[in-house]
């Protein structure tokens, strides 16, 4: 019988150099906030990952370690088991983090001054890393015609593409909105990319966290066009709560793109997986199915808890339930506060640390991104604090 994992247990993360907790004063000006911001979870890393690390720690030398076959095979097997995508070993390359992988790809495939397309509101490092590298961000904003449902604007996308556009950065599933893109949408995006000779960098770090019966579709698996024009980035870090162990990887099916990307990564000495990344990844991907199922069930219940609470106490506030992951996009425009006042209200009156929606693009100025990957008692307390603060408006 499978073990029953305890996601209700409250674990004190303060004074562990946790960015989510120990950077509150630096980021928000006070440290008495409930942390609902940084995208890691407050659930214990699963025991089988901890045990695998502990077993390796029993050997007292942590010297240079060569990548081993069972590590790579665990990625291949997991990807096929979870997503029916038959990845080949030679397509895989370790990367020291998803954002760093995107930076590596921009170095490999673009020059300064080239244009990179993003789809805001979207994960803010897409813009930051692009501009920091001297490339130009071009926006293809998502459309939201009813205040709830977002979609890609393919017509606007085609209108902004010119010969300087080289790359589209895709969040698949989307962050912060949690969209699980349909196969048809991804095929259409791939066709546009192929037509205009664009490379799609697909950030799929939330791919193993599809919710409510939704199924993630890997971008590169939807068509030959997608396979030939894409680099996919993934990791076990979100799903198994091991973000501090940098365990990301790239999947590059096309031989031409693979040669360019891998040669750049190898020349920069960035393609060798670290010892503990290999240990943690293999443990997660070979033993993690049941833990993942239970964790996702708990996250779904937390999302429903937030949606039901808001519907009962604050029906004017729109909760956009994600189709994937533990991040909830919430529209607070009904509170009638301007952007700066909304941010101040959340921090200094509700005493909540959420991500300011404006960081994902100007389209998010009246939104907050709430992390619900925490014990339900703490989530309930956060919602109660929000209610108390709203009562003072």
Where on the chain are the PLM-derived regions?
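N-terminal small-domain helix-loop-helix segment of the aminotransferase-like
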Residues: 2-97, 104, 284-286, 392-393
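Conserved core segment of the aminotransferase class I/II
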Residues: 51, 224-300, 390-391
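Conserved PLP-anchoring active-site segment centered on the Schiff-base-forming lysine
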Residues: 108-130
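Conserved glycine-rich beta-strand-loop-beta hairpin in the small C-terminal domain of fold type I
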Residues: 282, 298-307, 319-332
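PLP-dependent enzyme catalytic core of the Aspartate aminotransferase-like
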Residues: 158-159, 226, 338, 345-354, ...
């Amino acid at each position: 019988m499978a073990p029953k994992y305890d996601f209700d247990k409250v674990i004190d993360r303060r004074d562990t150099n946790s960015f989510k907790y120990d950077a509150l004063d630096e980021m928000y000006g006070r440290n008495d906030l409930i942390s609902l911001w940084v995208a890691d979870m407050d659930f214990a890393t699963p025991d089988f990952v901890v045990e695998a690390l502990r077993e390796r720690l029993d050997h007292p030398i942590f010297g240079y370690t060569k990548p081993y076959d069972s590590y790579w095979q665990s990625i291949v097997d997991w990807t096929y088991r979870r997503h029916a995508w038959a990845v080949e070993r030679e397509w895989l390359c370790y990367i020291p983090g998803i954002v760093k992988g995107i930076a590596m790809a921009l170095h490999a495939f673009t020059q300064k001054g080239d244009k990179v397309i993003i789809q805001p509101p979207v994960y803010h490092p897409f813009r930051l890393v692009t501009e920091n590298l001297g490339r130009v961000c071009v926006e293809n904003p998502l459309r939201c015609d009813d205040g709830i449902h977002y979609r890609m604007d393919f017509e606007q996308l085609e209108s902004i593409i010119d010969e300087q556009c080289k790359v589209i950065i895709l969040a698949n599933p989307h962050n912060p909105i949690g969209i699980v893109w349909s196969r048809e949408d991804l095929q259409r995006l791939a066709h546009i990319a192929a037509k205009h000779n664009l490379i799609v960098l697909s950030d799929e770090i939330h791919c193993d966290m599809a919710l409510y019966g939704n199924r993630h579709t890997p971008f590169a698996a939807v068509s030959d066009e997608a396979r030939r024009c894409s680099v996919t980035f993934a990791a076990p870090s979100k799903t198994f709560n091991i973000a501090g162990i940098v365990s990301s990887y790239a999947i590059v099916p096309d031989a031409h793109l693979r040669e360019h990307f891998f040669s750049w990564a190898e020349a920069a000495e960035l393609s060798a997986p670290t010892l503990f990344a290999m240990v943690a990844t293999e443990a997660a991907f070979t033993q993690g199915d049941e833990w993942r199922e239970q964790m996702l069930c708990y996250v779904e219940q937390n999302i429903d808890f937030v949606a039901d609470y808001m519907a009962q106490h604050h029906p004017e506030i729109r909760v956009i339930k994600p189709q994937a992951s533990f991040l909830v996009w919430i529209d607070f425009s009904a509170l009638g506060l301007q952007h700066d006042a909304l941010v101040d209200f959340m921090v200094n009156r509700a005493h909540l640390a959420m991500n300011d929606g404006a960081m994902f693009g100007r389209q998010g100025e009246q939104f907050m991104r709430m992390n619900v990957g925490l014990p339900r008692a703490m989530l309930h307390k956060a919602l109660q604090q929000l209610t108390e603060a709203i009562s003072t408006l």
